[in-house]
Amino acid sequence: MMRAILCLAFRLATLVLVFSGMKAFAQSQLPADTEQKIDKVATDALAKTGVPSASVAVVNNGQIAYLHAYGNARLDSEVPATPEMRYSIGSVSKQFTAAAILLLREQGKLSLDDKVGKFIPTLTRANEVTIRQLLSHTSGYQDYWPQDYVMPMMLRPVTAERILDTWGHKPLDFEPGTKWQYSNTNYVIAGVIVEKVSGEPLLQYLQQKIFAPLNMKSVTDTDKAKLGDTDPTGYLRYALGPPRPAPVEGSGWLFAAGELAMSAEDLARWDISIINQSLMKPASYQEFQTEILLKNGLGTRYGLGVMVRSELGHRELSHGGEVSGFTSENLVFPDERVAVVVLTNQDAAAASEAIATGVAPLLLASDDPATPQKLAQARQIFEALQHGTIDRSLFTDNANFYFNEQALKDFASSLGPLGTPKEFIHTRQLLRGGMKLRVYTIKFPKSELRAWTYEMPDGKLEQFQISALN
C-alpha cells in the first residue's frame, strides 16, 4: 500500500528487542560506526512503533554488505527473528510481475503497447487500455483491495478470473492514461497475461526466469503455501492495542500483486540484479525505471512496478508493500550501487518505512553541496521560532504571510519549552513542484519532531513546517 512521504510513526509501547546473529561479509563490509547507526535506526523504529520484528539487508558497492534481524518473529513463544526468515513482501511483488512482462517482450511475444483486449477481450474497454498502462497504474481499472484490512470475502479462496469478473468489468475510474491511481487490479490482469502468453503458471515462469538465475532460494508463493512454523507470524493492532495474529488472506487474492514471501537477503539479490542490469536487456531496464508521463505531460513518479524519484539528490527506485500482518520497504539507488531492504511483521505500521528512510542517508552522500549550509540554516530558523521570531528576508511573501503574529506565538509556546535539540538531522531531499523539499528530524530527550522546507530556485523558503513524530 502506498504511504505518504511525511507519514507519522505510531506512538506505541516499547518492546524489549532481541538481536539475532549477523552474517559477516568479506567484501563491501560497512564501517563499524555505520553498522551501529543502522542498529540504532532499526531498534528505535521498532521501539517507537511497537512492531515485533524487522529483517534488514543492505547492499553497498553492488554487494550484500549487511544482514541483521531485530526483535521477535513470534511473540507467543518469543522466537527471535533471524535473517534467514521469510516475510511477505506485499506489493514489492509487483516489480517481479512487471519483469515477467518485460522478459516476454524480449522474446517478441508481446509489446508494452499491446491492448489488453488482445489477451483478455472481455474486460472493460480492453481495446483501449495498454499493458504499459496496467504496469504504471494509469489504466483506470478500479482497485479491488484499497482497504488496509482483510474483509470477510477475502478469507475465502478466489481465482484471478473471479476477481476480474467483478473489478475488470466495472466502468473505468478515469480515461486511460489521464491519471495515476494505484490499483491491484492492474497487476492481476498483468499476471493473467503472463500466464496466457508464456503458457505457464505465473510463479513457475518467475521461478525459471528470475528466482533460479538469481539464486533466490527462499522465495515462496503465499497464495499456494502459507508461511510456516520457521517463519514470522504476521500481526495487526486495533488502534493502540496489543499485537494480535493477523488473519491470512484466502488463496488467490494476492495473485501477481502481492503474493511473494522471501528473506531480506533474497530481495537484496534482486536489487543487485537491477543495479548490475544482469537479468534483462538494457532496453528492458530503461522501460522499467523510466517515469511514465500522463497524456497531459505530467509525471507520475512511477515506472513499471517501481516508484521513480530522487532521494538526497540521488535517483531512487522504490516500492513499499503491505499485506495482512506484514509491511516492507525496498529502496534501490542504481547509480550509487546501493540498496536497502526492510521487512517487518505487522501491517498498517510505519516501521519499515522509518527504518529504510533512516538507513539510506547513512549510505548516501548528498550530491547537493549546499546541504550542510541548509541544515545549519534550518536549525537557526527552528531556534528562532522557539523564541517567536524569524528572519523574514529568508522567506517568500507567501511564507511571510503564513508566519503571522499568532503563528509565531504558537511556535514559541509549543517549541520553546522543549529546549535545545539533542540532534538535528537532514533525512530526505527531493524535488516537488519545482522546489527542493528537505526533511529534517529533530530529536529531544522525550520527543521527536519532523521539519520540512520548500526552497524556491532563488533560495528563498516557501515553507517551514513542523509536526510531531511521537
Whereabouts are the PLM-identified features?
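Active-site SXXK
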Residues: D39-A42, V56, G62, R86-D113, ...
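Short, conserved catalytic-motif segment at the N-terminal edge
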Residues: Q29-I89, K109-D114, H169, H314
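Short solvent-exposed beta->alpha transition segments
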Residues: T389-G434
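Short, well-ordered beta-strand elements
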Residues: H319, E329-N345, A451-W452, L461-S467
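Bacterial N-terminal signal peptides
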Residues: A9-K23
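Short, surface-exposed loop or secondary-structure junction motifs
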Residues: N72-L75, N127-S324
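Short, gly/Ser/Thr-rich active-site loops of penicillin-recognizing serine hydrolases
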Residues: L343-A407
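Exposed beta-sheet edge and beta->alpha loop/turn motif
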Residues: Q429-N470
